């Protein structure tokens, strides 16, 4: 008698089966008059930002014209927003900033230099200097 598999609906997990981008919306704010927004205005007029937005269809781009310095606001899935000021930054640096922050998870960056922590016991056991034969022990 053949064994039949039980049908089950797959559970959506990030990285298994489907990938959900953590950055779901980017707001671009610029001033139409200010000098610090010139490079961003050039990026908007020559279609560079449009090409970038076409390459990222899973991110919603919102462009606002407000007074003040230009900035990029990144909205992440964990309800975190990051604001990055891009005043007087060249076009290629703006694109680099867009790619860098759109690939982040929204969590704070931290330096991972902690010791390994595990809930499992060590395979070798805990080392003790008394495990070494007496002839090889360190003598002071």
Curated annotation (Swiss-Prot):
GO biological process, one term: mitochondrial translation
Protein name: Large ribosomal subunit protein mL43
Matches recorded under PANTHER family: 39S RIBOSOMAL PROTEIN L43, LARGE RIBOSOMAL SUBUNIT PROTEIN ML43
SUPFAM superfamilies: Thioredoxin-like
Localization per record: Mitochondrion
Family according to the record: Belongs to the mitochondrion-specific ribosomal protein mL43 family.
Assembly: Component of the mitochondrial large ribosomal subunit (mt-LSU).
GO MF term set: structural constituent of ribosome
GO cellular component: mitochondrial large ribosomal subunit
UniProt key word Mitochondrion: yes
Gene3D superfamilies for the chain: Glutaredoxin
Stored Pfam families: L51_S25_CI-B8
Main function: Component of the mitochondrial ribosome (mitoribosome), a dedicated translation machinery responsible for the synthesis of mitochondrial genome-encoded proteins, including at least some of the essential transmembrane subunits of the mitochondrial respiratory chain. The mitoribosomes are attached to the mitochondrial inner membrane and translation products are cotranslationally integrated into the membrane. Also has an extraribosomal function, being essential for mitochondrial genome integrity. May interact with MHR1 to take part in the mtDNA repair mechanism.
InterPro entries: Ribosomal_mL43, Ribosomal_mL43/mS25/NADH_DH, Thioredoxin-like_sf
Keyword terms: Mitochondrion, Ribonucleoprotein, Ribosomal protein
